[in-house]
Each structure stands twice: as structure tokens, then as C-alpha cells.
Amino acid sequence: MIELILVIVILGILAAIAVPKFAATRTDAQISKGRSDISALRSAIVSERQSRLIKGDHDFINRLDNDVDANTEDVTIFDSNESLSATSPKLLMYGLKTKDAAGHWLKTDDNEYTYKFGSASVTFTYYPSDTTDDNDDFHPAGSFDCDHTDENCKKLTQ
């Protein structure tokens, strides 16, 4: 009987230690997924730009999706843009489905996308042309970036 109580106590202690570790691991996995998505997107933007330069087009693509409505779930983003025809190459071969949940992207405005991880979220903006924002921060054409003063942005980009 004492052995059974001892086993239950040990399992309780292990559970109290392990549960917070597993919760942190899930958020870390979502951050890693976000970093991977961001790297793939940035690489695809540059690759598409190089393809356009070879063809004599000096402009960056104008959007990262097929004019998807903001805050709409279960639609594909980052797969194409309105200037591409059905036979043209896509931005990402396999776009990402939107969802308003941790570990997922959601389009929140024209050329603005939010990535959620854990209880945090970070908004990224795509700049198809050179832009200076309201804070006098300069964003070069083709950049896909967030506010680097935000700690959550730093977790995804640094």
C-alpha cells in the first residue's frame, strides 16, 4: 500500500515538473515554424524578383496573395498574387491556410499578415515599393518585416 502511495506521489511530482516544460516546448515549436515560414517567404520574394529582372520587369510583386479578404479563415495565402497568370510560377508552391489560432497566419489587411504563437501575435507587412511609415522608418521595396522594437518580432526574426 505504501508503495502505491509513493508511486502516486512521484507521478504527481513528475507531472508538476513536466507540464510546464511541454507547454514551453509547444510555443518554441510554433516560433520555429514561424521562423521557417518567414525565411521561405522572404526567399520566395527575392526569387520572384530575380525572375522578373531577367524578364526586364524591375518591380517587386504587388501582393503576396490572390486578393484574399482580411480576417478570413481557411483560405490560402502566400501562394500567388494578382499580377500572376494561372500559368505563371507561384510565390510559394504550397501556400499556407489561414487560421486565427496559435501557429498559424491570418491576413489582417492589404499586405499585412499576423502570425500567432502561444498567446502572442506579430504583424508583418509586405512593402511592394520603397515606403516610409508614420514613425519615419524606411522599408525598402520587397521587404516583409515586422516592428523590431517588439520583443515577439525579435523572437521570429533574430
PLM-predicted stretches and their roles:
Residues 1-27:
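N-terminal single-pass transmembrane signal-anchor helix
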Residues 21-39, 52:
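Aliphatic-rich helix starts adjacent to a transmembrane/signal segment
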Residues 45-89:
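Short, glycine/small-hydrophobic-rich surface segments
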Residues 77, 85-105:
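Long, low-complexity, serine/threonine/proline-rich intrinsically disordered regulatory regions
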Residues 107-114:
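Short, hydrophobic/aromatic-rich segments at coil-to-beta transitions
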Residues 114-158:
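Short, surface-exposed interaction loops/tails
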